[in-house]
């Protein structure tokens, strides 16, 4: 196959003696000035480098080099962009699902904050200014630090995070708790309006109250976490407020 192609090419070249004959006067030095683009290596290299530049098309000086944006390259770049976007979306979805699972476990855990753990560290060999403005600023910083230390123990994993990450996680945790309280309120309204509910629980903005009524209603379905878990979740929401 290769030999046939080579023979055919040689046959075609033989039909062009003016261009292919090495003894032809076309290749003489006298014609170098006539065809500078063919024989001037410097010009050829510069011209070749210009055509290889991105954003250049030979003959127009505009647009792009056609060889640099082949259909396969364009298609592969679009495919890679879509795949990267889908991977980012999947990572975001997995992160949100993992965060929600951690939050659901955290709302079931009792909260116990040791007062000694949130006390400000004792300063040693530090001269404390008696200036009123300095004293007020120091007290303000101490209150902020104390609240941050308390918040670290309320947010799941907050003690292992830096302050910025912990505050960001606290925002997600508060949104999760508000969503859970809202869903429980909606369930309380739905189950409470169905022919009387004995011992049903009403969850309001200020906490939980028990209401008794006639009939044989079943009360509130606590979304699989039980009454204790619901009390704990509402308590966590109130503390974070």
UniProtKB/Swiss-Prot annotation:
* UniProt KW Ion transport keyword: no
Native organism: Arabidopsis thaliana (Mouse-ear cress)
Q: Where is the bHLH domain?
A: 128-177
Location in or out of the cell: Nucleus
Q: Which SUPFAM superfamilies match?
A: HLH, helix-loop-helix DNA-binding domain
Q: What is this protein called?
A: Transcription factor HEC1
Query: Gene deleted: what happens?
Result: Impaired pollen tube growth.
Instruction: Give the UniProt keywords, A-Z.
Output: Developmental protein, DNA-binding, Nucleus, Transcription, Transcription regulation
Q: What does this protein do?
A: Required for the female reproductive tract development and fertility.
Output the superkingdom of the source species.
Eukaryota
Tissue/organ expression: Flowers, especially in gynoecium.
A GO CC term?
nucleus
InterPro entries xrefs: bHLH_dom, HLH_DNA-bd_sf, IND-like
Any one GO molecular function term: sequence-specific DNA binding
* Pfam families listed in its UniProt record: HLH (PF00010)
Q: Which Gene3D superfamilies match?
A: Helix-loop-helix DNA-binding domain (4.10.280.10)
The keyword Nucleus is assigned to this record: yes
Which positions form S-S bridges? none
Tell me, which GO biological process terms does this entry list?
carpel formation; gynoecium development; positive regulation of DNA-templated transcription; regulation of auxin polar transport; regulation of DNA-templated transcription; regulation of gene expression; response to temperature stimulus; transmitting tissue development
């Amino acid at each position: 196959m290769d030999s046939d192609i080579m023979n055919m090419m040689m046959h075609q070249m033989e039909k062009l003696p003016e261009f292919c004959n090495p003894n032809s006067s076309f290749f003489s030095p006298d014609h170098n000035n006539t065809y500078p683009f063919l024989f001037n290596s410097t010009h050829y290299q510069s011209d070749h480098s210009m055509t290889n530049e991105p954003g250049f098309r030979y003959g127009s000086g505009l647009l792009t080099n056609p060889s640099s944006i082949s259909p396969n390259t364009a298609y592969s770049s679009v495919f890679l962009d879509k795949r990267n976007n889908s991977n980012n979306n999947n990572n975001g979805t997995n992160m949100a699902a993992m965060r929600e699972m951690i939050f659901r476990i955290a709302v079931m855990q009792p909260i116990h904050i040791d007062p000694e753990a949130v006390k400000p560290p004792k300063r040693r060999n530090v001269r404390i200014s008696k200036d009123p403005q300095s004293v007020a600023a120091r007290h303000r910083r101490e209150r902020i630090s104390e609240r941050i230390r308390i918040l670290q123990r309320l947010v799941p994993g907050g003690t292992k995070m830096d302050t910025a990450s912990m505050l960001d996680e606290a925002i997600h945790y508060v949104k999760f708790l508000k969503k859970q309280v809202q869903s429980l309120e909606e369930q309380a309204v739905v189950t409470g309006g169905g022919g009387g509910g004995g011992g049903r629980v009403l969850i309001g903005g200020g906490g939980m109250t028990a209401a008794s009524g006639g009939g044989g209603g079943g009360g509130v379905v606590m979304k699989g976490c039980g009454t204790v878990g619901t009390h704990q979740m509402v308590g966590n929401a109130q503390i974070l407020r």
